[in-house]
Amino acid sequence: MQRSIAMTAKRFLHRNLLENGKPRTASSPSFSHCSSCRCWVRASSSVSGGDLRERLSKTRLRDIKLNDAIDLFSDMVKSRPFPSIVDFNRLLSAIVKLKKYDVVISLGKKMEVLGIRNDLYTFNIVINCFCCCFQVSLALSILGKMLKLGYEPDRVTIGSLVNGFCRRNRVSDAVSLVDKMVEIGYKPDIVAYNAIIDSLCKTKRVNDAFDFFKEIERKGIRPNVVTYTALVNGLCNSSRWSDAARLLSDMIKKKITPNVITYSALLDAFVKNGKVLEAKELFEEMVRMSIDPDIVTYSSLINGLCLHDRIDEANQMFDLMVSKGCLADVVSYNTLINGFCKAKRVEDGMKLFREMSQRGLVSNTVTYNTLIQGFFQAGDVDKAQEFFSQMDFFGISPDIWTYNILLGGLCDNGELEKALVIFEDMQKREMDLDIVTYTTVIRGMCKTGKVEEAWSLFCSLSLKGLKPDIVTYTTMMSGLCTKGLLHEVEALYTKMKQEGLMKNDCTLSDGDITLSAELIKKMLSCGYAPSLLKDIKSGVCKKALSLL
């Protein structure tokens, strides 16, 4: 059996190394090239065995810092005789938990140079570290060395390699490795299969994941909660809500209890698809099954309720979350603050803002952006500007969205001149302005009758390396209509079609539809009913006409 496994694994190893270019040795970075490692030379080399045993205890290793771990290794390799390989493995495992994979690889090489004989556990640690560093070829080299020494790979070995392949999106190689192991009578555990299914789902190959799922069931391998959760996530991300719900039911029928991750994934999917009622029912089902919702579950549901203007229910859910001992984080606060601001209840949003500070949570750029926009929407320009000024005082860096909100708010509230001062300052500071920034200013100019200035700015976009989107075009066309510049409107319309921006009803977003409706209204009010308007009505904006 061992010889059969070794021969098959060697063939697989040889094929994979050749496919990926020149075979590489398993040599790993020397200590001089490992930034995390320090000098090995110490003033004293006398180390007592009792001291080492105490430092290698589970209690000490549990919270060990990297520098202390390297010091301990240095003392271990100076000790005579060397500590057992079990002790070295325990230390290496502790460093793995720190995610310092390159350090583990270097220490493993040092052990080899010193003649400290590895066991299967050591090889598995090093293979896993190479895989975590996205160096699957080097992991395969270690596998080859391990086989030459007569060690038989176990489930951990195969699981690590499968994970390594999947991390590199080499799912077919992962499947091939598992198939080869099965051929020779080796039975990988569900962990290896789960890694493959999860990888297929994350690369949008959900149908392949389902086929693989059915195949392992036929082989008599029982899926677990991780298997189902990966599939539920994959289906949700592919907008296959019904299939995900059926899979959840199938899971329960097979007496595999879903966990909070499974439920949260499906609940979030329902929310994003506008199925808030189903999301609430799923939440209630979780509670009935004694599965405690976590911060992700609550935040998803709060977000869904806010998106559908059920702000009071969202607030109640927030209070329930806190009462259950689930501490609200900045994301959950931002979600509810945004809901209040959208509902024109910015003062309620401010209460939450102050509550965050009282609870020791630090507001971020998103928090400030949300409240600044909320004040502008409420018509409180002074408060919005004051809040913007506070950002610098509290060390919160504004991003491009902050400035876009500021420009839009000023323009919408009749403060174009102030907006232009800020816009000019942004240009002087060579900020990375996006199409939203320019569209906002163009809209503000058109709104105040400065169509020529808007047209000049629009025409300069290509020189700035920016491409107008449908919002930019529609905004500019609307402004031109007010000045009776039909020739320019028709030219822009033709350009939009050439750019492929004239979408059909199926692909228009809600914002695009609203803009199209506004444009049609503007053209009708200006007395235009040429073939252009007829074309727009019949082709692009059937949905928009319902808004007229």
Swiss-Prot record:
Keywords: Mitochondrion, Repeat, Transit peptide. InterPro entries: Pentatricopeptide_rpt, TPR-like_helical_dom_sf. One of its GO terms (cellular component) is mitochondrion. PPR repeats lie at residues 84-118, 119-153, 154-188, 189-223, 224-258, 259-293, 294-328, 329-363, 364-398, 399-433, 434-468, 469-503. PROSITE patterns: PPR. Residues 1-43 form a transit peptide. It is found in: Mitochondrion. Disulfide bonds: none annotated. The keyword Mitochondrion applies. It comes from the Eukaryota. Belongs to the PPR family. P subfamily. This is Pentatricopeptide repeat-containing protein At1g62680, mitochondrial.
